[in-house]
Amino acid sequence: MSKVMTLKDAIAKYVHSGDHIALGGFTTDRKPYAAVFEILRQGITDLTGLGGAAGGDWDMLIGNGRVKAYINCYTANSGVTNVSRRFRKWFEAGKLTMEDYSQDVIYMMWHAAALGLPFLPVTLMQGSGLTDEWGISKEVRKTLDKVPDDKFKYIDNPFKPGEKVVAVPVPQVDVAIIHAQQASPDGTVRIWGGKFQDVDIAEAAKYTIVTCEEIISDEEIRRDPTKNDIPGMCVDAVVLAPYGAHPSQCYGLYDYDNPFLKVYDKVSKTQEDFDAFCKEWVFDLKDHDEYLNKLGATRLINLKVVPGLGYHIDMTKEDK
């Protein structure tokens, strides 16, 4: 059965206000921007997010007031913005409810969710501010239905009496959204390069949406199963979205759009400029096709990477 849908229909069917969502990719690598823009257009809000090594995707959701609670380790457009500006401003202003874990623990939490574990025991974070301080208090947690009542609990190691380990909760993800290079109509997905948390969140979530650069036939994708990363049984919607990770990069196909990210770094310094940017690049555009038309063919083609090198060569002096 074909799972191919339009982006508008996939978001409308599977993503709802109040959901706990997880986004694939890593800072400026294969982030599902096209899907995030559609979430913004559809007015979906009150989201709980487990961000991992997040980027401008989560920064835009936060800056538009769509995030109710945010569990995170790092949010940045690496190499351009070391700490995403709307994320930082909203947190410093007390407008963002956020919890902080170490990056290694967050990625293990995702894997534990994929395995269906009830909780995750770790030896990490002990003796650090991550256990000394809670970003979300117990009192506030009781008001958040998608956030566990405790950040962690100390438990005894049953195999080593007297040793304490940290038990962290396993996320209950409603929707995972991933951008990949290739997918087939039955939902099988191929990810080139780093996989990051993408396989885990696809397996853990109740629903998974995959936007992709290319849809290849079910027959073709089965010819070399060693290249496949996510089985079709884990995917609910497949969406054709060329350059769906822009302005981040998509390994093997196109580089990140450094001038675009620099503009975003500048405009995200103030809420007024950020809002104007979102109006121009998200809300005034009907869909992803209009976004690509606004970027223009020349700009998009110039981002294509040189085969074997992994980056594009049409770089201005400003970019070098």
Curated annotation (Swiss-Prot):
Pathway listed: Amino-acid degradation; L-glutamate degradation via hydroxyglutarate pathway; crotonoyl-CoA from L-glutamate: step 3/5
EC numbers on record: 2.8.3.12
GO BP of this protein: glutamate catabolic process via 2-hydroxyglutarate
Keyword presence, Oxidoreductase: no
Annotated compartments: Cytoplasm
Keywords: Cytoplasm, Transferase
InterPro entries from the UniProt entry: CoA_trans_fam_I (IPR004165), NagB/RpiA_transferase-like (IPR037171)
UniProt GO cellular component terms: cytoplasm
UniProt record similarity statement: Belongs to the 3-oxoacid CoA-transferase subunit A family.
Job description of the protein: Catalyzes the transfer of the CoA moiety from acetyl-CoA to (R)-2-hydroxyglutarate and related compounds like glutaconate.
Protein name: Glutaconate CoA-transferase subunit A
Encoding gene per record: gctA
